[in-house]
Amino acid sequence: LTGAYNYDTQAFWHNWLRDLALGQKDNSEGYIGSTVPAQGKGGIGFLSMLGWGNAVSIIPTMLERIFDDKEILKEIYPSLKTFVECEIGRMKDDLWISPSLGDWLSPNGNMAWQAMNNGPVSNSFIVNDLNVIRRAASILGLEEDHLRYERQYNKTREAWIKKWCSPDGIVASDYQSAYVMALKYLDLDGDLKKKVQEKFVDNVRRNGLRTGFFGTEHLLPLLMEAGEKKLC
């Protein structure tokens, strides 16, 4: 995002997304490999760890925001749809159940724990993918797709909240990265959002920074949104 803000990287990202789409053809299910351009076959499941493959929705959203790119959704839609269908195919009770590293490289260094407890982080990326594709389908006039992904977005979002978010605002047993991802991607309702923000701020005050590779970029903006300028 910072690079795109400071430099004209639009053509670079269009080309990179074409490489991403080509890499999906290297495996049987359309997963996105762990590198783009792909270095060998993308593999199934583990080599498409969530957070990496979700660039298929995150980068187009950035291009729209920074460059007012009107063509990117049409260009990337087949690739995005292929990946989202892979995600849905690996769901149980509307949540992802395959391996992932979670919010790795956090200061506590416990990568095994992060991998074993990757669910709230991984599934927040899926909620965002579904949100992006339902909007893209609507913009592109793909009504059947829009209805399908609208339903799945609502089901996965509700399943996430039910599984990891308690009524008092504690998220995933007070896991800092889960607070961040919930506030970033889950579009929490007003009262619940306020409670989650309060627990999130309390967690940061007690523990300092405990987010990893995925959560850290959102930490300060979310603290600012919660009115915690001094804590930032």
Residue ranges of each PLM-predicted region?
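Active-site core of glycosidic bond-cleaving carbohydrate-active enzymes
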Residues: L1-L231
